[in-house]
Amino acid sequence: MSNINQMPREEGIDSTWRLMEEGYMYILNRRHSFNSDIFETRLLGKKAICMGGKEAAEIFYDTEKFKRKDAAPNRVVQTLFGKNGVQALDGQTHKHRKEMFMSIMSPDELEKLTDITKKQWEIAVDKWEQMDKVILYEEAKEIMCRTACQWAGVPVQENEVKRLTKNLGAMFESAAAVGLKHWLGRHARNYEEIWIEELIDRVRDGKVNPPENTTLHKFSWYRDLEGNLLDTETAAVEVINILRPIVAIAIFINFIALALHHYPEEKEKLKSGDKKYSQMFVQEVRRFYPFFPFVVALVKKDFTWKGYKFEEGTLTLLDLYGTNHDPEIWKNPDVFSPDRFAKWEGSPFSFIPQGGGDYFMGHRCAGEWVTIEVMKVSLDYLTNRMDYEVPDQDLSFSMASMPSIPHSKVVIKNVKKRI
C-alpha cells in the first residue's frame, strides 16, 4: 500500500509567464487556491515544486535534502549573483566561504558601519536642503553605495560614485527582467567585476592597502579549503556580494518612507527614540513590504516529505513573501503592525524576508544584520533628524515587478535638517 500523496499540480505546459505576470503573489495565490502549502508546476520548461510556510522553510534549508549549485537560472547568475559566488555553493566549501562573510559581521564592524551610515546621511541631508525635490530611491542608492564602499575598504573616486551606484543597482533591478533591461544588468555586472578584479590584483601586488578588517582586504587574501587564494574573478564576485546587497537596502529605505507616510501614528511613536520600537518597526517593514519573492534550490537526492515525493534534481522554490504573509504564522498578516514583534521569538524559518536557516551553517543571508542596522539609522534620520514634505505622487507599487518599489520612487521636498 503506497503512502505517497498526489501533489497538487498546476495545469498548463509551462507557467513561467504566469510567474512573471504575478510576481510576488504567484506562489501565494496557488497556495490559497490549492489550499496547500506545496504544489507542482512547470517553470522554464522543467518540472518545479513550489512551497511556503514555516515547515516548508525548515525542510528547504536542510542541506541533506537540497543543494544550491546550478539551481539559479543562468540569467539571474549573470545579473544578480555572479558566477561561483557563495549562494551557489554547498557542503564544506559553502561553510568555509560563508565564514569569510561572517568574519566581517562582528559587533565592532557593524558599529563602524552604523557610524559611516550616519555620516553619509548627514552629507546627503545637507545636499537635499539645496534641492527643489529629492527622489529618495535614487538618493538612497547613492548613500548606500558610498557607505558600502567606505565600510568594505573599496577606494572609489568621486567621479566614479554615480557609475558604481547605477551599475550596482542595475544588478538587482534587472534580475527578473527580460530584453534590454536584462542586458544592461549583465553589462553593469561585467564592467564592475573587471573594475574590482583590477583592484584585487593591486591589493595583492601591494599597490593598494585596505584596512585589515575590511571586505576588500579579507576577500583578497582569503584561502579556500586547499589553501589557495581565490581566483580574482571569484574574489571580485564576492566583494560585489557585499556591495550590491547594501545598495539594495535603498528599497527598504523607500518602504520606510512609505510606511511613515501611510501610518503617521507610527511616526509619532518613533519620535520618542525608543530603540526597541525602532527595531520592531524596521522588522515589520521587512516583513510587510516585498523584497525577495522566493529562493530556489535543487533536490539533492530522492526523499519523501509529508507523503510527497521529491525527486533528485527537481527545481524547488520557497515562497519568502508568502511565508511572511502566512496567516498560520502571522495574525492579520496584511495589516502593518510593528507591535507584532514585541514578543517575537526570532524563528529562523517563519520570518524570512532575505531567506531562512542558520547564518553560519546554512544559506541565511549573511548581510541581514547589516540590513537591520542600516535601516535603523535611516529610520532615525527620516523620523527625528530632518523635516520634509511628501507631495502628491503615485506611491503605489506593483506586486508583479521584482524588485518592487513605489512608482514615484518616493519624492520628497522642502528638506530641512533639524538642529
Curated annotation (Swiss-Prot):
Name of the gene: cypC
Name under which the protein is recorded: Fatty-acid peroxygenase
Binding site for substrate: 244
Broad EC category: oxidoreductase
Xref: Pfam families: p450
Keyword Secreted: no
InterPro entries, alphabetized: Cyt_P450, Cyt_P450_E_grp-I, Cyt_P450_sf, Cytochrome_P450_3A
Record carries keyword Magnesium: no
CDD domains: CYP152 (cd11067)
EC number: 1.11.2.4
Binding of heme, residues: 61, 68, 94, 98, 365
Disulfide bonds listed in the record: none
Highest taxon, organism lineage: Bacteria
Family: Belongs to the cytochrome P450 family.
